[in-house]
Design a protein with these regions (language model features):
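Phosphate-binding/catalytic loops
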Residues: 95-173
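Short histidine/acidic/glycine/proline-rich micro-motifs that form metal-
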Residues: 44-46, 91, 146-147
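Alpha-helix C-terminal capping/helix-to-coil transition sites in glycosyltransferase folds
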Residues: 78-80
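Redox-cofactor binding/interface segments in oxidoreductases and associated redox assembly factors
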Residues: 86-87, 106
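Short glycine-/acidic-enriched loop or helix-start segments at secondary-structure transitions
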Residues: 23-25, 51, 92-97, 116
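Short glycine-rich anion-binding loops that position phosphate/pyrophosphate groups of nucleotides
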Residues: 19, 89-92, 111
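Conserved active-site segments centered on acidic
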Residues: 1-75
């Protein structure tokens, strides 16, 4: 990304099933990106449906879900991505090489669908995922993308993947 595109930055979020984490990240970035970013999401092994708790957590957080079912990478490999961000370890391992040399980063998040326990505990896990994704995306949006060289930008985008629930949503860069 040596030059600033004349279009919004394109971001692809990847996870295994495209049923929770990547869908959540896509919805949040599209809500907060202010037209500067356009996000999509996909899975390496798409699930049959989006987890209803992911949709509920987004809705109750005031974020509109895109409404698309889980999908794979078909039709997405030839798009001109500026950023490809994996949000689960399995997707990181299976992440293909995209044309155009996008900035690739890993923002691993626990799978909220793996949480066991009662309904409230499961629901809380999805809200925690929305909170963590929102914090990371806020940091991402604070990066001065127009002023950073590709290598510096890639380093900073990757570092966002280390942000935890306990850190503030935005910090000086």
């Amino acid at each position: 990304m040596p030059t600033i595109p004349s279009r919004p930055f394109r971001v692809l979020f990847l996870c295994t099933g495209n049923s929770a984490r990547s869908q959540i990240a896509e919805a949040i970035l599209n809500r907060l990106g202010g037209g500067r970013f356009v996000a999509e999401s996909a899975g390496s092994q798409p699930a049959a449906r989006v987890n209803p708790l992911a949709i509920e957590a987004l809705r109750e957080s005031g974020i509109t879900w895109a409404g698309h079912p889980p999908r794979g990478l078909d039709g997405l490999m030839d798009k001109d991505w500026d950023f490809v961000i994996t949000v689960c370890d399995k997707a990181k391992e299976a992440c293909p090489i995209f044309p155009g040399q996008p900035v690739v980063a890993h923002w691993g998040m626990p799978d909220p669908a793996d949480v066991e326990g009662d309904a409230e505990r499961k629901r809380t896990a999805f809200f925690d995922t929305v909170t963590l994704a929102s914090r990371r995306i806020s940091l991402f949006l604070a990066l001065p993308t127009e002023k950073l060289a590709k290598l510096a930008l890639e380093t900073r985008v990757r570092a966002i993947g280390e942000v935890t629930m306990d850190e503030p949503a935005a910090r000086e860069g």
